[in-house]
Amino acid sequence: LQWLPQTSKNRRSALFVLGGSVRFLVWGECAAPAIYNEDSVERLMREWTEIIARDFSHPSIVTWVPINESWGVPKISFDRTQQHFSQAMYHFLHALDKTRLVISNDGWAMTETDICAIHNYAHGQKEETEKYDYFKETLRTRENLIKRLSTPWPIFANGFSYQEQPILLTEFGGIGFDVSGQPGWGYTSVDNEVEFLKDYQRVLSAVYASVGLWGYCYTQLTDVEQEINGLLTYDRQPKVDLAAIKAINDQFHVSQVE
């Protein structure tokens, strides 16, 4: 399973139409509020009502993600009020749309959720072998994915626990590679195409060594304003030979299917 979250501004996008025509799976997200208060709660509930009314008929959308990485709910790990809001959004979206999955807080500190969605960028530079070994170990089994943390935050918020949901690595990679002089950053960095492809294969090797993961989403398809970790530049030009990327993907994926 591979898919692409639709992030940033919510607008009717050709991505949804394209996804439907090429059988590409898309997750519906929206921009997060800067802070948590009653106004942000009301605004987000209203915006999600509009989002689902607008995008419900797109078959490419398979999951709704109202919260990502605790943005807008910074105390969700321990604050019961913010946890209530996360749970309310989970049930609210299910009430509006019974056909799709809902993730309560993509990345970590989840409450009620249909997918256990984990973010892990802790693979390190190629020379950081101990860091890479730990990264690989955190992914190796279902138990490790839940208990061996790669961030300061727990996978589930206080009072909540893993309930046998499918576990997906919904953000990883983030290999920074600048080919256009755009300022920005990545979680790790390389200097040329050869290094990028080697690092891409190194990271995917750890992912496919896991016996606990059900799927993944690589970060990310394109560079954005402040990040240079895309497979494509900001103006959608390939940074590396895309046939080489496909060959690496097929090297793992086809063997698993067969």
Language model segments and positions:
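Active-site mouth of glycoside hydrolases
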Residues: 1-127, 160-164, 195-196
